[in-house]
Regions:
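Catalytic or ion-translocation cores adjacent to nucleophile or general acid/base/metal-coordination motifs
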Residues: 20-40, 105-146
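Flexible, glycine/charged-enriched surface loops at secondary-structure junctions
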Residues: 28-32, 138-153, 196-215, 272-288, ...
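A conserved active-site cap/scaffold subdomain adjacent to cofactor or substrate pockets
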Residues: 120-230, 246, 250
Length: 379
């Protein structure tokens, strides 16, 4: 059986694709389960009337300011709809924005018959899923501690969870590459967890503050001490809305004086933009290979700069006015010959792109009605 949130924002399209595949392979009676209810866009007006304000997790803002710009409103739902499909005999279950760990909790709860308020077992199921949900990341992928010594990363395996009565163990298939060790599990265990004593999920509030992670064999780690508390009364809601427009332009410069030339080129571009009267809401200038990731804490010392083989200038312009973002585009290409020496295109000609922003918030749990469905193929 397969449980997946591959439905995204087009669950029906995903279901239809699976149906066509199954019927194309003469699979009559194949049961496709699918879960609806995570899309609550049509419920937003009533929730606002009821007094729900949709506060933004990241910054102060008025939700009403984006109402006419909203594209999607999708809730992180839990395991219930998935379990419902399994109970109806589904061979595959498709969801939209279900929490990743819920995909693993649902078959565990269904198979073992855990009660809806068995918080400790639900928490164990969630954390087992949490260690599996990112695939190879739980078996040595994206492994910071000792990445050089991960065996056969080109054949990276996925982690496997084996549950006992009060613990669970993480391992992998023996013929796959990767590594399962205490440190690799710790990195994935804490991934996306802001408060170890209160890891909020749609299904349970998980407490891993006293959890144990112990190597018990080759590529085998035991997890114990995971506890659960009642689930939250709200669910996370991700609202996607139109924010504006952006243009990202890049030029690469070769040694010698790569950074100095890139920096001077940025000055030239900005002077040209001033003459064109560009009115941008934000302009971000960075240098790939130097500070595009580390920003203000990057090492920009003379020693770090003087022997660079190459440097890529990146200029990003953001505006609510699409035409303002377009002004920079025709000025980039000529600078290969009409600017500092040693320049070349990086990534092709720039284009104006729409910016879809995220409004992360919560919604009352009782405002979300999750439903399970079964479509049976008939070849």
């Amino acid at each position: 059986k397969i449980c997946t949130n591959a439905g995204g924002m087009n669950i029906n399209g995903c279901v239809d694709g699976i149906r066509q595949w199954a019927e194309g392979n003469s699979m009559s009676g194949y049961k496709i389960g699918y879960v609806t209810g995570d899309n609550i866009k049509d419920k937003i007006p009533q929730l606002l009337k009821d007094g729900w304000t949709f506060p933004n997790f990241d910054y102060d803002g008025n939700f009403n300011d984006i109402l006419d710009k909203i594209y999607n409103c999708n809730v992180y739902i839990g395991h219930e709809g998935i379990e419902g499909c399994l109970a109806e005999g589904a061979d595959v279950v498709i969801t939209g924005r279900a929490a990743d760990s819920a995909l693993f909790l649902a078959p565990l709860k269904y198979e073992f018959g855990w009660a809806a308020d068995d918080w400790d077992n639900l928490a164990r199921g969630i954390m087992a899923g949490h260690l599996l949900e990112c695939g190879g990341q739980g078996a040595g992928g994206n492994y910071m501690y000792d990445w050089r010594n991960v065996p056969r990363m080109d054949e990276l395996g996925f982690p496997i969870a084996e549950l006992t009565d009060d613990t669970f163990e993480i391992t992998k298939a023996p013929d796959c590459g990767g590594i399962i060790c205490e440190q690799s599990c710790k990195e994935q265990f804490l991934y996306e967890v802001h408060d170890p004593a209160n890891y909020l999920t749609p299904d349970v509030n998980v407490d891993i503050s006293h959890a144990t992670i112990t190597q018990v064999g080759d590529n085998r780690v035991r997890i114990g001490g995971v506890k659960g508390k009642p689930r939250p009364d709200t669910l996370k809601l991700c609202v996607g809305y139109h924010k504006g427009w952006k243009t990202v332009s890049m030029l690469s410069f070769a040694w010698p004086d790569a950074y100095e030339k890139a920096q001077y080129c940025a000055e030239v571009i900005m002077k040209k933009m001033q003459r064109r009267g560009m009115k941008a809401d934000d302009i971000h200038i960075s240098y790939i290979g130097l500070n595009s990731l580390h920003l203000g804490v990057a090492d920009m010392s003379e020693e770090a700069l003087k022997n660079l083989n190459e440097c890529v200038l990146r200029i990003a312009v953001f505006s609510e006015d699409k035409s303002e973002c377009a002004k920079i585009i025709p000025e980039i290409s000529p600078l290969q010959l009409n600017g500092p020496p040693g320049a070349s295109f990086f990534g092709g000609r720039a284009r104006v792109q729409e910016v879809m922003a995220l409004w992360p918030t919560t919604v009352p749990r009782d405002a979300v009605q999750v439903e399970s469905h079964i479509l049976e193929t008939n070849y």
